[in-house]
Structure formats: C-alpha cells, structure tokens
Swiss-Prot record:
Gene3D superfamilies: Translation initiation factor 3 (IF-3), C-terminal domain, Translation initiation factor 3 (IF-3), N-terminal domain. IF-3 binds to the 30S ribosomal subunit and shifts the equilibrium between 70S ribosomes and their 50S and 30S subunits in favor of the free subunits, thus enhancing the availability of 30S subunits on which protein synthesis initiation begins. This is Translation initiation factor IF-3. Keywords: Cytoplasm, Initiation factor, Protein biosynthesis. Belongs to the IF-3 family.
Length: 185
C-alpha cells in the first residue's frame, strides 16, 4: 500500500510536472529538474499537490507552512465532529416523585451534553394490563423536559416501553438553573 505522504523536492521522481508558481499562476508542463531549479531560486520547496494527475501537479511553496495549514484544517474538521451517544434512563410505572425528579435531572444533563436519551419503562407481572400508566409517565417526562424533540415515539417492545429524545436545535437554550428550576415545579 502506498503511503499518503506528500512528496517534496528530490522525492519527486517523474520526468515532467505541471507547475504552479508561488503566486498561484500556471506555468505549464516543465521538466522536473527545471521546476526544482525555479523553486531553489525562489528559496521555496517544490511540493507535489496532485500525484495522480497526468502529469502530476506540483507547486512552488513553503512546505512547512503548507503542512501547518493542513494540520489546522484537519483539527478544525475534527473539532466540528461530535460523537452523539445514546444514553438510557430506566423508569418503572410506580416510580415515586423523588426518584422521578432525580432521573429527570439526569436526562436533562445528558441532553445538555448533546447526547440522545432512551427513556425506557419496564413492566413486571400485572403491570402489563396498565400500559396507559406507562404512556402517561412518558408523556409527563416529555412535558417536564420541554425543549426536546422526540426522535422515536413511545412504543412497546415486549415488556418494555421506550421513547428516544434529543435536545431541540435552534430554540432558545435555557441555562441549567432554569431547566432544573422548572423540573422542581
């Protein structure tokens, strides 16, 4: 497998290259040794920009500066990426008020971090006859959180009812204090 390293100066071993000078203007197809001489006269490097082109495209530039700009560009792209995790918070139909508040705050924390949250509700035994309690609880979670988008509506999977939520984009972001103050009410 060929390495992706950029070839510079004497590493370029093709007879002819399409040359772009330091001002960004096309010089045309020239012999590689002539292009190297022009780069040395300018006090810069001959850098192979597009090795797959016929003939390869080379540019006269400061290679150190080029590498620095490439690394900055990669860092900026990496910074823009955000890995979204799916967190799960489990409830029961008989979840008491105190536990409900704690779990709701945990969901709010996950959403503030930008994660998606799977809210699951587990039914045991005869609780399956009262699925409406589960829908009511998930509806209450949705209401209490306020600034969210339901990605997956509540649905029953065996003995478990699940709903996936995420933070709404573009709406007024509240501070954590305001969120928690609303949850306590």
């Amino acid at each position: 497998m060929r390495s992706k390293r950029t070839r510079v100066n004497n590493q370029i071993r093709v007879p002819e290259v399409r040359l772009i000078d330091e001002k960004g203007e096309q010089v045309g197809v020239v012999r590689t040794d002539r292009a190297l001489t022009m780069a040395e006269e300018a006090g810069l490097d001959l850098v192979e920009i597009s090795p797959t082109a016929k003939p390869p495209v080379c540019r006269i530039m400061n290679f150190g500066k080029y590498q620095f700009e490439q690394s900055k560009r990669k860092a900026a792209q990496k910074k823009k990426q955000r890995l979204v995790h799916l967190k799960e918070v489990k409830f029961r139909p008989g979840t008491d008020v105190g536990d409900y508040q704690v779990k709701l705050r945990k969901i709010a924390t996950f959403l503030d971090r930008g994660d998606k949250v799977k809210v699951s509700l587990r039914f045991r035994g005869r609780e399956m006859q009262h699925r409406e309690l589960g829908l009511e609880l998930l509806g209450r979670v949705k209401r209490d959180l306020g600034n969210i988008v339901v990605e997956q509506e509540p649905r029953l999977e065996g003995r478990q009812m699940t709903m996936v939520v995420m933070k709404a984009k573009g709406e007024g972001n509240k501070t954590k204090r305001e969120d928690h103050a609303e949850i306590k009410d």
